[in-house]
Amino acid sequence: MGSSSRVGDENSLLDLTEKVAVVTGANSGIGLYILFHVARAGAKVYLGARTEAKFNSAITRLKTEGLDTSKVVWLPFDLSDPRKAKESAKWLLERENRLDILINNAAKILGPYAQTSDGLSDSMVINHMSPYLFTKTLLPLLESTARQPGSDVRIVNVSSVAHRWVPNPRYDSLEAFNNNFADTWKPKTNLYGYTKLANVLWTKELQRSFDRANIPILAMTVHPGNVMSEGNVKLFTSLMFGTIINWVFSLFFISPFDGGYTPAFAAASRVIAEDRRKYAGAYIVPFGVIEEASEDARREDLAKDLLATTDAVLKQYDYA
């Protein structure tokens, strides 16, 4: 399917009028179009972006796509420090009495390994620890919404097929979290995949916790597809014969609009509403298909290690 394809019948999503949603990293790329699909269905949507300038730029682009942006609100959002992520969640808690949809989309993609000022892998902070704490802080609001009549609360964590490519993953220590994969063939890809595997493990454990407590919330992970995103365009252009490479990949990659559909499907599809248990903890690929996640992603021991270490690190650095 070429990058010019347009998928996603708006009638395939529930009517989200009177519903409240959050989409992080929604000022560009896939996130912009996740928000487009959800907002088009009628929801009030908080657009997570680091600056108001980025928010305003996104609004301009959404308007050119024909979206009524009157119910799109800026959520000041920065994943570079878990404290900032928690502040964003608390900011939202002060302003809303319900939250129906949370889509954790913001992420660091294939950048070089780096550490935060606290000496932590910035990829793990941005892609896992900050979204984890952001979500944890919002759980009371999500749970109270889920108990209201007629509610259909969903948490969608955007992962990647790269979660399948991690060699011998461990999450049992801070040292494991800080692995730079320098001794592997593709360190950047493996580092990214390591964080995306964490997304799947966390989501499945989150669903198990909801099920144990009989809380009617769905948690799902999504691979949005191989998307001709702005980041990929820049990456391909930077290579030798970049123009040709961009053209070739555009024949096989999908557009950001199409890439935004599968996360929106997970967040608001009528199909899921009709068979919620089928999708509980599911890993979903384009365009709304359940696929079995990797063997490592299904390991409960890895999930328990991940959450134990995450909570310990958040406590150690006084983030929580």
From Swiss-Prot:
Annotated protein name in UniProt: Short-chain dehydrogenase/reductase ARMGADRAFT_1169971
Broadest EC class assigned to this enzyme: oxidoreductase
The enzyme's E.C. designation: 1.1.1.-
Function of the protein: Short-chain dehydrogenase/reductase, part of the gene cluster that mediates the biosynthesis of melleolides, a range of antifungal and phytotoxic polyketide derivatives composed of an orsellinic acid (OA) moiety esterified to various sesquiterpene alcohols. The first step in melleolides biosynthesis is performed by the delta(6)-protoilludene synthase PRO1 which catalyzes the cyclization of farnesyl diphosphate to protoilludene.
Lineage of producing organism: Eukaryota, Fungi, Dikarya, Basidiomycota, Agaricomycotina
Residues bearing carbohydrate: N157
GO cellular component, one term: membrane
Segments traversing the membrane: 19-39, 235-255
Organism: Armillaria gallica (Bulbous honey fungus)
Pathway assigned to this chain's UniProt record: Secondary metabolite biosynthesis
